[in-house]
Amino acid sequence: MAAGSTGERPFFEIITSIRYWVIHAITLPSIFLAGFLFVSTGLAYDAFGTPRPDAYFQASESKAPVVSQRYEGKSELDLRLK
């Protein structure tokens, strides 16, 4: 071991090992697939409470609603949606 070494394996040794690629060949595509399904099924909208793209405006509105009172914004928008 070289002087000043922390005892960790060198990065090059890790990424050239078979064990690394056996583990990551499964986990990396799985993470990507899980993220893709989370977004494409719409579960992300439900989990974070954001409106879906077709729910931002009512069909009769052609532009975004303008809030005139800073601290009463939520109640103004609630009135518009009723």
Curated annotation (Swiss-Prot):
**Record-linked Gene3D superfamilies:** Photosystem II cytochrome b559, alpha subunit
Cofactor (UniProt): heme b
Q: Where is it localised?
A: Cellular thylakoid membrane
InterPro entries hit by this protein: PSII_cyt_b559_asu, PSII_cyt_b559_asu_sf, PSII_cyt_b559_N, PSII_cytb559_asu_lum
GO MF annotations, alphabetized: electron transfer activity; heme binding; iron ion binding
Coiled-coil ranges from the UniProt annotation: none
Assembly and binders: Heterodimer of an alpha subunit and a beta subunit. PSII is composed of 1 copy each of membrane proteins PsbA, PsbB, PsbC, PsbD, PsbE, PsbF, PsbH, PsbI, PsbJ, PsbK, PsbL, PsbM, PsbT, PsbX, PsbY, PsbZ, Psb30/Ycf12, peripheral proteins PsbO, CyanoQ (PsbQ), PsbU, PsbV and a large number of cofactors. It forms dimeric complexes.
Return the protein name. Cytochrome b559 subunit alpha
Origin species: Synechococcus sp. (strain CC9311)
Q: What are the top taxonomic ranks of the organism?
A: Bacteria, Bacillati, Cyanobacteriota, Cyanophyceae, Synechococcales
Q: Which gene encodes it?
A: psbE
